[in-house]
Amino acid sequence: MAKEINNMDDLAIALQPTMKKMIDNMANRVYETLNFFLQRYYDSYNPIFYRRQYDFLRSGFKVNARIVRGKAVASVYIDMDYMSNYYGVTGQQVATWANEGLHGGKNLASNTPHVWDETMANTVDNGALVRDAVAYLKSQGFTVRV
């Protein structure tokens, strides 16, 4: 079905479903990558003196794409409040240590990923999200040059 577009506002509205889906796909990629590195973090060290809660492993969250003031937005984040039951340490501190490759503030394993930094390196910094966006737009019939 053809849409009549008379101005830039009409064009922006017509493009919103495509942009929303593209942003949701990009957020999914970041979320999957974050969960991959969260799992690698847990796999890198097996605690001897305590039993794991697994709250940090399940602390990654994704908010589906939506249109806000004419723009498609989505969120992927580590929920610090989700880790509120750690003894004597905040969720913020747990996430900070994990991003420094530390377990409980200590360097206990040589192969511990820096969870958030490696997520960004493998999605944003390496251009994967841009490639995914271009591929999606092309699949929708857009001509895209990078």
Say what each PLM segment does.
Residues 1-77, 95-146:
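Short, Lys/Arg-rich flexible segments
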Residues 71, 80-92:
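Short, surface-exposed beta-strand/loop "edge" segments at domain boundaries and coil↔beta transitions
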